[in-house]
Amino acid sequence: MNTIWIAVGALTLLGLVFGAILGYASRRFAVEDDPVVEKIDAILPQSQCGQCGYPGCRPYAEAVGLQGEKINRCAPGGEAVMLKIAELLNVEPQPCDGEEQQAAPVRMLAVIDENNCIGCTKCIQACPVDAIVGATRAMHTVMSDLCTGCNLCVDPCPTHCIELRPVNETPDSWKWDLNTIPVRIIPVEQHA
């Protein structure tokens, strides 16, 4: 019985010593992250889609914060994310698709041909925002409100039943282009 207590005491002492060493090492050799990169990474949608040309949101945030990369390359985040990053960095907003000549990119949506879907769930596993629902060997469908059009679900599909299509405007999504509405100013006479 005495040897058990010696073993327990020795293991406890070793745990305390190694814990203290690890605690000291974590503070002594800590790497400080750039707070601007942290804030940019918090603004990005974390979909890890790669449409910006970087393998994920964190590398893109580092490129924007440290290397001066353009702030308009996040397609899933769109204009809202670009404006937040521009405000954070105190820079001028840029067109949200990365191409200066096209100010309003067409929103794309993944569409599944349900007749050809075999229910393999590879598209569900590839979707970074969980916009595809379905079960194994059952029909899958895309929730249009969540789909960012990142194209990551298209390649894994073995039957090639997924394609990206432009989103059609509906009465709910259509917006007035106020610059094309003719406005006529009528002078008003003041009567005393």
Curated annotation (Swiss-Prot):
* Residue ranges that the Swiss-Prot or TrEMBL entry lists as coiled coil: none
GO biological process, alphabetically ordered:
electron transport chain
**Named cofactor requirement(s):** [4Fe-4S] cluster
Q: Which residue ranges does the record annotate as region Hydrophobic?
A: 1-26
The EC number(s) this enzyme carries: 7.-.-.-
UniProt-annotated binding residues for [4Fe-4S] cluster 3: C127, C147, C150, C153
Instruction: Indicate what this protein is called per its UniProt record.
Output: Ion-translocating oxidoreductase complex subunit B
| Species for this entry | Salmonella typhimurium (strain LT2 / SGSC1412 / ATCC 700720)
Give the lineage: Bacteria, Pseudomonadati, Pseudomonadota, Gammaproteobacteria, Enterobacterales
- What's the gene? rsxB
